[in-house]
Amino acid sequence: MASPFPPSSAVRPRDAASLLIYRHAGARVQVLMGKRRPGARFLPDVYVFPGGALDAADARFAADALARRAAAGRAHMVLEPQWLQALAARHGLHAAALLRAALREAHEESGWRWPKADLPGLDSSGVRYIGRAITPAQSPRRFHARFFAVPDERMQQDPHADGELLDLRWVDVHNPERLPIIDVTEFMLTELQRELGGQRKAWPLLSYVNDAVRVRRLPISP
């Protein structure tokens, strides 16, 4: 797979996060995706998962979540699942901030939101960590994106939301080829299948070297 981005001077990648909202349709697995607007600066007219850059509010929210857990005598656990505990042990609040960014962006872009009752302590039961990817050095807009996944029944639809993504649809993870997607998206769809099938023992980092994709499988790290 070659890089889909045009040559440009290297810029530092921004921390970002995406959320794969998935559902089971019989024996098949489907993921919610939408098309970026034609005038978007990054990947216009391409189908993506809801997601975006980490912002200062995400870090503040994560700090508040940790404070609530400290008050409850659980300061050592930023988040519940074992893999998120590992992220938190290595990077502290950064792990919680990334998950919060994924949840926030999902609401803003698709209208699907995390239950309000679960937000104060950032109860993340049911969430899976899929992997991460770093945009090629030649891209004019670069991201160090982490990908999380959650079943649709764990989310709520906001009837008043006007999502930023167009043409929201459920896409079969086994057959996304008819839509314009980039290699990172295709890769994460495959990783979701492997995760749900219990076939993974490590978490991937996808990056680009000399315009070619490189995948390393590493211990959990955000």
Regions found by a protein language model. Give the residues of each.
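N-terminal leader/linker segments that precede catalytic domains of diphosphate-processing enzymes
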Residues: 1-222
